[in-house]
UniProtKB/Swiss-Prot annotation:
Keywords: GTP-binding, Nucleotide-binding, Repeat, Ribosome biogenesis. The gene is der. SUPFAM superfamilies: P-loop containing nucleoside triphosphate hydrolases. GTP 2 binds at residues 187-194, 234-238, 299-302. GO terms for molecular function: ATP hydrolysis activity; GTP binding; ribosome binding. The keyword Nuclease does not apply. One of its GO terms (biological process) is ribosome biogenesis. Belongs to the TRAFAC class TrmE-Era-EngA-EngB-Septin-like GTPase superfamily. EngA (Der) GTPase family. Residues 3-167, 181-354 form the EngA-type G domain. Associates with the 50S ribosomal subunit. It comes from Cupriavidus taiwanensis (strain DSM 17343 / BCRC 17206 / CCUG 44338 / CIP 107171 / LMG 19424 / R1) (Ralstonia taiwanensis (strain LMG 19424)). This is GTPase Der. GTP 1 binds at residues 9-16, 56-60, 119-122. Gene3D superfamilies: 3.30.300.20, P-loop containing nucleotide triphosphate hydrolases. The lineage of its organism: Bacteria, Pseudomonadati, Pseudomonadota, Betaproteobacteria, Burkholderiales. Residues 355-439 form the KH-like domain.
Length: 447
């Protein structure tokens, strides 16, 4: 599991700048809850070999009781609930503000591990930067510059250390708990995840998940279907931890991200009776970014007329075209229709994700693809694609060697991906293609 770090502070202290710097390795935004323009954002980052999840929040004014600012405060409180460590950011140039005191008072009551970061501290002496903020009672401040990166690595390193002290299991590798294929069922609230879980495991079990505990402790449920073992990773909802925040929503982005990372195959469940939302697309995007095998289930399909079904299929093709590699199934978890085909696709997706691709066959498919359609010239030279081999599994990675490969266009990369998919019948898994210009047996050959 990955430590979760929430960034909290009043408006315009540099939270988003710090968030973008922390998560730059993963393109920053991986999930964005709908609603306000200043809802909380989630991203993944990495310091060395240590991954983490960061949450960016809107400007926090905890004493405001109504309006958009109050809604932003609610989002921030939710982020604090989900976090292992909270980084409280203040502005070193403007000094201590009354809002900072109010935020500090609130954070002290949460029981979370809090780190105080004084941003915009570039060019300032530490003693002068820190002096204003000791009275907040948050310990020694960390002087940073989110814009320039000064002090950020040390800050995040320490945040991860504090998180591991709080929850030692965060230092462990992805869980090997359970038997067979590990499945995560994800989706926004009320799409029928719990009903599908009960249908798969054959008993009213999900209610047992909703017990007091931490917000992110995974629960593994083993079951068999057709004589095959599987392990289901619980994503049934967010549990309350203490009395930090009473009105906790049932959908937890952090819980979803953690379960996707731990799964072999993800079932993305959609609601046929609701339009595809930005939230659906964000969850789907993270699954693809994570490289997880995927099956899409469109639930509540029973009772819909032919015209409605055609419209839904058209919307799926239009809004989720980047999931064309996945199998879509139209099911009813309540009526238990379509579940067998859904699970067969789970097996197929897992097999595709773990496939072994021999180098001679990969190279032959590559050469046939180039012979059929060469990459476009870049300036005076044309990229030369020489040979291919497998660089990893789950998802499959195909490494292509050659010359001048930095000039290969994205459209040509997609063309090659489609050729490899068709040749090896890779359905249900993302496929990564990497281009590598290096010394190889063909490097000095003549065309």
């Amino acid at each position: 599991m990955k430590p979760v770090i929430a960034l909290v502070g009043r408006p315009n202290v540099g939270k988003s700048t710090l968030f973008n710097r922390m998560t730059r390795s993963r393109d920053a935004l991986v999930a964005d809850l709908p609603g306000l323009t200043r809802d909380r954002h989630y991203g993944e980052g990495r310091i060395g070999e240590r991954p983490f999840i960061a949450i960016d929040t809107g400007g926090f004014e905890p004493v405001v009781k109504e309006g958009i600012v109050a809604e932003m405060a609610k989002q921030t409180k939710q982020a604090v609930v989900e976090a292992d460590v909270v980084i409280f950011i203040v502005d070193g140039r403007l000094g201590l503000a009354p809002q900072d005191r109010a935020i500090a008072d609130y954070l002290r009551k949460t029981g979370r591990r809090i780190m105080l970061a004084v941003n915009k501290a570039e060019g300032m002496k530490y003693t002068s930067v820190a002096a204003d903020f000791y009275e907040l009672g948050m310990g020694d401040p960390y002087a940073i510059s989110a814009a320039h990166g000064d002090g950020v690595r040390e800050l995040v390193d320490e945040a991860i250390e504090l998180a591991v002290q709080e929850r030692p299991e965060l230092a462990e590798e992805a869980s090997d708990e359970g038997k067979g294929v590990k499945i995560a069922i994800v989706g926004r609230p009320n799409v029928g995840k719990s009903t599908l879980v009960n249908t798969l495991i054959g008993e009213e079990r999900v209610i047992a998940f909703d017990m007091p505990g931490t917000t992110r402790d995974a629960i593994y449920v083993e079951f068999e279907r057709g004589g095959k073992p599987y392990t289901l990773i619980d994503t049934a909802g967010l549990r309350r931890r203490g009395k930090v925040f009473e009105a906790i929503e049932k959908f937890s982005v952090v819980k979803t991200l953690q379960s996707i990372a731990d799964a072999n195959v993800v079932i993305l469940l959609l609601d046929a009776q609701q339009d595809i939302s930005d939230q659906d697309a964000h969850i789907a995007g993270f699954i693809v970014e994570s490289g997880r095998a995927l099956v899409v289930g469109v639930n509540k399909w029973d009772g819909l007329d032919g015209h409605t079904r055609d419209r839904i299929k058209h919307d799926l093709e239009r809004k989720l075209q980047f999931l064309s590699f996945a199998n879509f199934h139209f099911v009813s978890a309540r009526e238990r229709t379509g579940i067998g085909a859904l699970m067969r696709s789970v097996d197929d997706a897992y097999a595709a994700a773990m496939v072994k691709l021999p180098t001679p066959q990969l190279t032959r498919v590559l050469q046939e693809a180039v012979e059929f359609q060469q990459p476009k010239r870049v300036g005076a030279s044309r990229p030369k694609l020489r040979y291919a081999h497998q660089g990893g599994s789950n998802p499959p990675i195909i490494v292509i060697h050659g010359n001048a490969l930095s000039g290969v266009a994205e459209t040509y990369r997609r063309y090659l991906e489609n050729r490899f998919r068709a040749a090896f019948k890779l359905k249900g898994t993302p496929l990564r293609i990497e281009f590598r210009t290096n010394k190889n047996p063909y490097a000095d050959s003549k065309d």
